[in-house]
Amino acid sequence: MLLPVFTLKLRHKISPRMVAIGRYDGTHPCLAAATQAGKVFIHNPHMRSQHFSTSRVFQSPLESDVSLLNINQTVSCLGAGVLNPELGYDTLLVGTQTSLLAYDIYNNSDLFYREVADGANALVLGTLGDIAPPLAIIGGNCALQGFDHEGNDLFWTVTGDNVHSLALCDFDGDGKSELLVGSEDFDIRVFKEDEIVAEMTETEIVTSLCPMYGSRFGYALSNGTVGVYDKTARYWRIKSKNHAMSIHAFDINSDGVCELITGWSNGKVDARSDRTGEVIFKDNFSSAVAGVVEGDYRMDGHVQLICCSVDGEIRGYLPGTAEMKGNLLDTSVEQGLIRELSQKKQNLLLELRNYEENTKAELSSPLNEADGQKGIIPANTKLHTALSVNLGNDAQDAHAELRISTSNDTIIRAVLIFAEGIFAGESHVVHPSTHNLSSSIRVPITPPKDVPVDLHLKTFVGYRSSTQFHVFELIRQLPRFTMYALTSPDAASEPVSFVNFIVVERAQRMVTWLNQNFLLPEDSNIQNAPFHVCFTSLRNGGQLYIKMKPSGEITVNTDDIDLAGDIIQSMASFFAIEDLQVEADFPVYFEELRKVLLKVDEYHSVHQKLSANMADNSNLIRSLLVRAEDARLMRDMKTMKTRYMELYDLNKDLLNGYKIRCNNHTELLGNLKAVNQAIQRAGRLRVGKPKNQVISACRDAIRSNNINTLFRIMRVGTAPS
């Protein structure tokens, strides 16, 4: 139970997810939040007489205890914490789409300012792995960077897509923090420094992550889903029609275990049990919640949960006291038991009513009436499921097919399928019309990504005249590479792109991997090495060849570098391979990347020219303005008018130049994203240490602008000595 202890109403709007709290003088906790017009406000109710008078910070004209920090750019992320332990107080970190600012509020000075080409969408501050100093870690355009208090770039790696959320958590229980990364490609990745140690695939963009305790962490998605993971196992999740704006871990009932606090877009704040997701506490704001943080804001020795709304309302809550703990827990347990027993009672009453109706129907109906009208089916009725590949036709695209059938003359009235990431809304209902009922149903399935998916099936079985149906529930797993059909090898269509590596495994184990990950026909006969199998993608018709020699050498031919990476990662997981070096060549993809790198150089060159032109125009504006004012003071109106007309034209040129700069920057970001993704893809072709070496060597090659070395690294995994 949370107890409200204070409410503030600031006359400043707060940007969603842009709230941080810190002791910027080492003593007093102050709230910082991004507000309108590229500013950050600092609310300091403890020292109302303190005024700032520097170029960057100024007193708010609306409130005496609020100071404004001028960023002059749209703020994209905000954080606070100890970046330099020697200072003894917290640093404010402000990220934009082009830079990162570490600001020392106590001394009103920049700790450092860094241009960040990949932007800063998310930010977290803390210690990562064995890297000794605290880092300000930012996630941007497919890249992760970590800076120390001097602005030195001590950590860099790439990830699969644009980063939306970051958190530090001891994921593997080794006493050191790992980095959790949520991105646009729906994945949560766990980095142990620059090595990916785990990946969890979700159903939407991961917008928020927060550590809870140990290896447990909370997450939120852009579709209104929130939940809790413990390592790679999901404990629970719930989905709302509203969006989760902010999540935070806080112990509201003094039981030593943090609950998941969620602030929603409709203004609701709720606290959920980390074990079950059950709502323990809720409150409401009049507008959307902007952020949830914690701190001793009243300086009374008690930590409060602090919730902020986008309209500037701030509320502080205290957790329930230890004396209340027993009563609260007892009440919660009792309520849970009552709910559970009530649900069981309802289910039993419903089942009893069905039996009574069947008995009445049996007594009132003639003895020769079909049993189907009574909702009765044979006791030995079984439900069979089979997965196969359908190559499609003119009316329907190629797809995977789930066939559900009964073992006798009963019919299937409806099928409910629950599966993550395949159907809109994560569920699909097949409900044939009355004249199309049969004992068999075929359901087309088209997974958008190559990931294994559990299909949870609920099948309603009865007779045509039945008004009640038996529900068969079962789970069927969709293999990872379902969307690939086994075809006959054709040397003419074999892709020129390949990856080549050696595994110390028997051919039978390789065949087992194929059977687990592909939908192979029952009559396929793959026995011993050497063997050669060919698949065709149902999505785009691309070819995939997998060859294995008796020596254990495996060659995978495909023009899709992402597919090659998925296959290698799948094999590494199945065969428990820790380190795998690979030789790879993707001529078409590498040529496209070469063009992208040339474009990046061009855009950088254009950016420098535009910046130089803007600087020249700025100097010219100062000169024209002085001349125009001189002419005005001398009452030379003709000259003044001429100068102001020149200023007007120059201003138009500046605006046009700004639009060109914006377009150039957008194009540059798109190409930098492609470069970062290329490095990520080259890394995914390897496993373990070779993977980390490739990513690091690729970055060094790009820094030195050595394109030929970059492609050699991507091909063979190492730079030339």
UniProtKB/Swiss-Prot annotation:
InterPro entries: Bardet-Biedl_syndrome_2_prot, BBS2_CtH_dom, BBS2_GAE_dom, BBS2_hp_dom, BBS2_Mid, BBS2_N, BBS2_pf_dom, WD40_repeat_dom_sf. The keyword DNA-binding does not apply. Part of BBSome complex, that contains BBS1, BBS2, BBS4, BBS5, BBS7, BBS8/TTC8, BBS9 and BBIP10. Interacts (via C-terminus) with BBS7. Interacts (via coiled coil domain) with MKKS. Interacts with CCDC28B. Interacts with DLEC1. GO terms for cellular component: BBSome; centriolar satellite; ciliary basal body; ciliary membrane; cytoplasm; membrane; microvillus; motile cilium. The BBSome complex is thought to function as a coat complex required for sorting of specific membrane proteins to the primary cilia. The BBSome complex is required for ciliogenesis but is dispensable for centriolar satellite function. This ciliogenic function is mediated in part by the Rab8 GDP/GTP exchange factor, which localizes to the basal body and contacts the BBSome. Rab8(GTP) enters the primary cilium and promotes extension of the ciliary membrane. Residues 325-369 form a coiled coil. The keyword Cell membrane applies. Keywords: Cell membrane, Cell projection, Cilium, Cilium biogenesis/degradation, Coiled coil, Cytoplasm, Cytoskeleton, Membrane, Protein transport, Transport. It is found in: Cell projection, Cilium membrane; Cytoplasm; Cytoplasm, Cytoskeleton, Microtubule organizing center, Centrosome, Centriolar satellite. Pfam families: BBS2_CtH, BBS2_GAE, BBS2_hp, BBS2_Mid, BBS2_N, BBS2_pf. PANTHER family: BARDET-BIEDL SYNDROME 2 PROTEIN. One of its GO terms (molecular function) is RNA polymerase II-specific DNA-binding transcription factor binding. One of its GO terms (biological process) is striatum development. It comes from Rattus norvegicus (Rat). This is BBSome complex member BBS2.
